[in-house]
Amino acid sequence: MYSIKMRASKNGKHISGAERIVEKEKIEEVVKDLTKRALNHENGTPDFINIKVEKIVGEIEYIDHLPIITIPCKNIKEARKKAIEILINEGIPKEIILQAFEIIDRGGMRGAALLNLKGERLDPDKERGVRVKNIDVSESLKNEILTKNLGTERTVDAIAIASKVIHLGVLAELCTSDNKNYTTGYVATKKGYFRITNLKREGDPGGRVFFIKDDRNIKKLIEKLENKPCIIR
């Protein structure tokens, strides 16, 4: 199996990224698909596209996906109230949740901010954040999401990240899309992947925050988030 990673930017600013884990025979097809995706992104046409193909060394872990729950909300106020409610139920203080919203509303990070329950940033590079890599979803899960109207192509990408991070012991995740016109975001916990409509305003940037328990070994967690190969099924 091979990992294929795509990253696209313009004037040094991140536009889009995607990743797949595939058999050798599918490399050419997937590289073409990811290139097309980079060139046709709503955030603009990139002046730099990087595609990296690597043979996976070591065992791939297969992880069951989080249950997918969609919560329709009329506006950002209602959506954020619901997100806060879900996160408080996981034991996260409200002031820390509001701090997380401030981080994602600033945008600009390629990865996720790591925030403990004291409000301390744990990611080593505050500009970059921590990127969850070496992930994909099974074809059967992708087809189920798209054919049963459980979500969109963006849901397919997001469920991979959310399921991996929760499996590895992250307490919860809060995310809004860096696609400026896509306003549905999500909260992920061990109880599920909660798609919440109108979690940000159209045109606003997006971001991602992982809430971390204070007793976690951060170095070990980051290493697994970035390097442990996982396929979500």
Swiss-Prot record:
Signal peptide from the UniProt entry: none
Alphabetical GO biological process terms: biotin biosynthetic process
Cofactor(s) listed in the protein's UniProt record: Mg(2+)
EC class of the enzyme, as a word: ligase
Catalytic reaction list: heptanedioate + ATP + CoA = 6-carboxyhexanoyl-CoA + AMP + diphosphate
EC number from the UniProt entry: 6.2.1.14
Keywords, alphabetical: ATP-binding, Biotin biosynthesis, Ligase, Magnesium, Nucleotide-binding
Pathway per the UniProt entry: Metabolic intermediate metabolism; pimeloyl-CoA biosynthesis; pimeloyl-CoA from pimelate: step 1/1
Molecular function GO terms recorded: 6-carboxyhexanoate-CoA ligase activity; ATP binding; magnesium ion binding
Pfam families per UniProt: BioW (PF03744)
Family: Belongs to the BioW family.
Subunit structure: Homodimer.
Function: Catalyzes the transformation of pimelate into pimeloyl-CoA with concomitant hydrolysis of ATP to AMP.
Protein name: 6-carboxyhexanoate--CoA ligase
Organism listed in the record: Methanocaldococcus vulcanius (strain ATCC 700851 / DSM 12094 / M7) (Methanococcus vulcanius)
